[in-house]
Amino acid sequence: MIEAGIIGGAGYTAGELIRILLHHPEVNLNFVYSTSQLGKSLYSIHQDLIGDTEIEFTSKINKEADVVFLCLGHGNSKRFLSENKFSEKTKIVDLSTDFRMKANDHSFVYGMPELNQEEIKNANFIANPGCFATAITFAVLPLAKNGLLNDDVHVNAVTGATGAGTSLSATTHFTWRDNNFSAYKSFEHQHLQEIGQSFKQLQSDHTSEINFIPNRGNFSRGIHATAYTKFSGELEDAKKLYSEFYKDAAFTFLTDEELHLKQVVNTNKCLLRLQKFGNKLLITSVIDNLLKGASGQAVQNMNLMFGLEEKMGLNLKAGYF
């Protein structure tokens, strides 16, 4: 069994990670570290876990664990790893932004299996992608692979309230979020950098703009993204490119039907739909921001790192009705 630990166990992504790992056939959840919830049962915070586990939040860290997931606030993972040294055998999966951009001062691999599967299999350190970055990158990556990303990409995406985390703020409060809709961080969202990095990895001469408008939706979870760019070929040409690129992808699927968040919420899937309007290709992408956009993808990466079947523990059912 893989001995797993979680650092920072009280948030939404940690909660989803706990749920997956508790039912993963090859994993034993060894510890969940949280100083703010020390001594409390996991189900006192993640209340749906009552009856599933008696594990308590702890301040003790097993530095010999096989894999450790970091569910810390952005900017805290670097400091945590500098203060805590793990065994050489321990694999690290970081769910923050801290290591997503390539740099000479770290050896983290960007953990997008559809892009870097072989590197992930051989990695000891994984930087898990962001939720918006996952939905948007999947929508456009096949174009970059074929050197066709030569014009500006325009993206409009809506995320559920869980994308903002558990900390309260004026824009996450129920009375403001309910029956409301708003844009934020237009053209300057932090995920733009990693999206551009992925495009450039496959199309080195990529210099066109990514015009991204993120929106807050009045629902709990999920991301619905629409992206469009110029495409000179026919719709069938685009479908062939996308089908070829994702033919071996464990969780990414193409459809000709209208997409709905309910098809993917509570799953690790990404669904894509292609449409052609004049000289523009429109790609719709839907994911669960907490699963394919965070914890599910993290476990998918873990499976690859340990040589397990990629979908193990992740055959999850959508809450369709």
Curated annotation (Swiss-Prot):
GO terms for molecular function: N-acetyl-gamma-glutamyl-phosphate reductase activity; NAD binding; NADP+ binding. The active site is at residue 131. Gene3D superfamilies: Dihydrodipicolinate Reductase, domain 2 (3.30.360.10), NAD(P)-binding Rossmann-like Domain (3.40.50.720). GO terms for biological process: L-arginine biosynthetic process. InterPro entries: AGPR_AS (IPR023013), AGPR_type-1 (IPR000706), NAD(P)-bd_dom_sf (IPR036291), NAGSA_dehydrogenase (IPR050085), Semialdehyde_DH_NAD-bd (IPR000534). SUPFAM superfamilies: Glyceraldehyde-3-phosphate dehydrogenase-like, C-terminal domain (SSF55347), NAD(P)-binding Rossmann-fold domains (SSF51735). This is N-acetyl-gamma-glutamyl-phosphate reductase. It comes from Christiangramia forsetii (strain DSM 17595 / CGMCC 1.15422 / KT0803) (Gramella forsetii). The gene is argC.
